[in-house]
Every structure is written in C-alpha cells, then in structure tokens.
C-alpha cells in the first residue's frame, strides 16, 4: 500500500462531475489498484475513490504532479498535486480476512439451510466459496440457473457492497460461473449502501434472524 499526504485538488469525470478544491489530503493506493482520497473528518469513508480494476498514471514533464486514474468504464479521477508532504509504500502481505462475529456466521449457516429465502427455486452451490481474494459467503443458483454470489452482514454498510463488488468482478471472469449477479444480505441495510448496491446492479435482501431460526414473533401470536 502506498500512502501519500499532499495538498491537492481532485476532479472526477464520469457519469457526473465533481471537484474537490485544494486542501491537505491522504491518498491511498492499494495493491488491488484502487485509489481513494481521504480527509481528516470522515472516519473510514473517502471523499472520492476509484475501484479496481483501474490504472494510475503519474504525469511527467509539463504534466508532472498530475495523477490520472482511469477505470474500465473510462471514468477519470484527476489528482493535481501542489505539495507532497509524505510519500511511502508498505508491503502488507495477504490479509487473513475478516473473522465474522457469531451472528454473521450463524446467518450464513441458516441462510444456506434455507436458501429459498432468497427466492423460490434457489439451490445452494456451497458456503464459503473460495476466491483469490477471500471466500464468498454463499454461492448459489437461482430458478433460471444463473449464478448468484451472496455477501452476508449483520449491518449492511458501504464497505460490504464494495467487498461484494470485488468478488463479482473476479467471479465473472470464470466462464464456468459467469454471468454472476450479487445479493447483499443483512439484518439491516443502510440507505447509502442500498443506493450503491442498486447503482451497481446488486440486489438487497433484509434477513430476519429470528425467522431464519424458526422463532415466532410473540407480537403475531393470538394465544
């Protein structure tokens, strides 16, 4: 991972346009090719970013100090450096991945056992389908025989959608599986995550933990 702290301005050109005026910012360039720009007041959420696969070109000559990031759709993130305060690279190695909490692990097990929760005619291929970047929670087929990758969270936020997006990009390269569509499943899905998922063609499924466990809601009982 490369970390750059710089005074810079940022312009995005794609389905819409956006501009970040000059200010000190943190730029992360990850091994997967993603580039994200961060301020000091938004927790983990970037001000702007470009998801992989994308290419970073650092300008030379008259273009020195201008970084251009282009993704496969032709969208551009142009970062104009005014002053670089820090620039370092670090080899983090292969991450062991997130260890799911008890509820998420149980949700995965329950949903695999009741895969028709996602729709009539769904069949399970396998849980923890391994890929080069980590395991997909559930891989299944819909009633039409299409492949579906399911990412399960207790609380569905943007980072979960990004994770599923990376899995889908990889799975769709496999001719034996493609086309693969995604379903983001959680007990609660944040509005921003739902908007991002919908924009990327990913379905959303709210999971009722008690219903999956076969526990009736007392409020629905008449006696």
Curated annotation (Swiss-Prot):
Domain of life: Bacteria
GO cellular component: cytoplasm
EC number(s) on file: 3.1.-.-
Record bears the keyword Nuclease: yes
Subcellular location: Cytoplasm
Family the entry assigns: Belongs to the NucS endonuclease family.
Entry protein name: Endonuclease NucS
Organism expressing this protein natively: Streptomyces coelicolor (strain ATCC BAA-471 / A3(2) / M145)
């Amino acid at each position: 991972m490369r970390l750059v702290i710089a005074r810079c301005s940022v312009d995005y050109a794609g389905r819409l346009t956006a501009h970040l005026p000059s200010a000190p910012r943190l730029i992360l360039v990850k091994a997967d090719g993603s580039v994200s720009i961060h301020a000091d007041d938004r927790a983990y959420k970037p001000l702007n970013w470009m998801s992989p696969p994308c290419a970073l070109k650092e300008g030379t000559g008259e273009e020195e100090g201008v970084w251009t990031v282009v993704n496969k759709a032709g969208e551009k993130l142009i970062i104009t450096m005014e002053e670089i305060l820090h620039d370092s690279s670090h080899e983090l190695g292969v991450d062991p991945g997130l260890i799911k909490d008890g509820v998420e692990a149980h949700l995965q097990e329950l949903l695999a056992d009741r895969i028709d929760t996602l729709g009539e005619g769904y069949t399970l291929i396998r849980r923890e389908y391994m890929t080069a970047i980590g395991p997909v929670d559930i891989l299944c087929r819909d009633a039409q025989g299409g492949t579906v990758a399911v990412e399960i969270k207790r609380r569905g936020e943007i980072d979960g959608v990004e994770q599923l997006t990376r899995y889908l990009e990889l799975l769709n390269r496999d001719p034996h599986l493609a086309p693969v569509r995604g379903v983001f499943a959680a007990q609660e899905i944040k509005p921003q995550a739902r908007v991002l998922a919908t924009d990327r063609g990913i379905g959303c499924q709210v999971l009722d933990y008690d219903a999956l466990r076969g526990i009736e809601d007392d409020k629905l009982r008449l006696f």
